[in-house]
Every structure is written in C-alpha cells, then in structure tokens.
C-alpha cells in the first residue's frame, strides 16, 4: 500500500520543439510569468548541443520572476531530436532531478534544440508537446507537413507581425494548417505584443493541466 505521506504528485511534462529561431525560447519567456500569475509553479529545462546558452538567456529574462535554480540547461552533444526522442536519457535524468528538488511544482517545460519538421518527443519524456513555427520561414511551412507539425498537441504559428515583410498570407497558413492538422488546435502568436499569448496559456491550462479557465470578466 502506498504511503500517502510520501507519495509525490505528478508534475506535467510539456515538450516545446520547432526549428532554429522559431521563437521557442521566447514563447517560454512570455508564458512563464502568466502561468505564475495564475498560480502555476513551473520548471524549465532547455537543450543546446554544445552550450547552455538558452538557459542563460531564460535566466536573464525571468530574473526576479522565476528562481534561477528552477531553470536548467542541458548540453546534449547530439542531434536535437535524438535527445528528446530516440535517446532522451539525459533529459529524463534532468527532469527527474528537477522533480526531486522541486516536488511542489505543477509543470515542467522541456525545450528541445532547434530542429526540422520531423521533431517529436518521446512519451517517456513528455506528456504533451507544443511545436513552434514562425511566419518568416515561409507561407508554405504548414503544407510541408512533418510529424512535429502535424502531431503536436498544440501548433504555434509565431512572429505573425512579420507576415507583410516576407510576403506570407496568414489566411493561407491557417487554411493549410487546418488541412494538415484536422481538428488539432493551433494558435497565432506575437511574443513582442503578446497577441495570442494569454490564449495559449488558456489552452495549456485547459488541455494539459486540466484546470478550469475562468472566462474574462467572470468573478472568482
């Protein structure tokens, strides 16, 4: 029989993947303060191949918002998708270390290194995953399919403010996304202005944390 006094709650693990420069780190940086404001206790793990630069960046950005000890960089030394799918042992060890140190946490975000459209997360590592693409990669990106983009629990189409500068139609990108993803959710975001970010947090809380999202204007 399990001793309830020592039983540890399940901390939800969310993978965040996508190509280099799509805004994975920026997404983490903008959703973290909102999650904290809503009472969620997050942890963050970032992946880089030969550095821990993303972790350093996140620590600088979230200084005074999230304790630095709750942000961990993993230097994988390997292909990004290998470290989160084929052999996620380094990341699993990092996750277990963080869960052991901060058992009161609700959520751990695991950012992969930048990779191509085939990147997915091993279910041994992540319970859910978000895939981030950006408009500057080209209007045709959703049409290219790829398991990462198609199978993600949430697809984020980021940097929508750049659409007019790169000749991309957001209407076309949305239409193509609906074709390749069916009913799977997606959202358009702009990390600089905050467009779509609150809604993304709503989706995370509702679909990943199974937490009631209070409609705007509703009294607690």
UniProtKB/Swiss-Prot annotation:
Residues the record lists as binding GTP: 18-25
InterPro entries: CobW/HypB/UreG_nucleotide-bd, P-loop_NTPase, UreG
Membrane among keywords: no
Compartments, record wording: Cytoplasm
Disulfide feature: none
A Pfam entry, by short name: cobW
GO molecular function per UniProt: GTP binding; GTPase activity; nickel cation binding
One BP annotation, GO: urea catabolic process
Keyword GTP-binding among record annotations: yes
Keywords: Chaperone, Cytoplasm, GTP-binding, Nickel insertion, Nucleotide-binding
GO CC terms: cytoplasm
Function according to Swiss-Prot or TrEMBL: Facilitates the functional incorporation of the urease nickel metallocenter. This process requires GTP hydrolysis, probably effectuated by UreG.
Subunit structure: Homodimer. UreD, UreF and UreG form a complex that acts as a GTP-hydrolysis-dependent molecular chaperone, activating the urease apoprotein by helping to assemble the nickel containing metallocenter of UreC. The UreE protein probably delivers the nickel.
Protein family membership: Belongs to the SIMIBI class G3E GTPase family. UreG subfamily.
Protein name in the entry: Urease accessory protein UreG
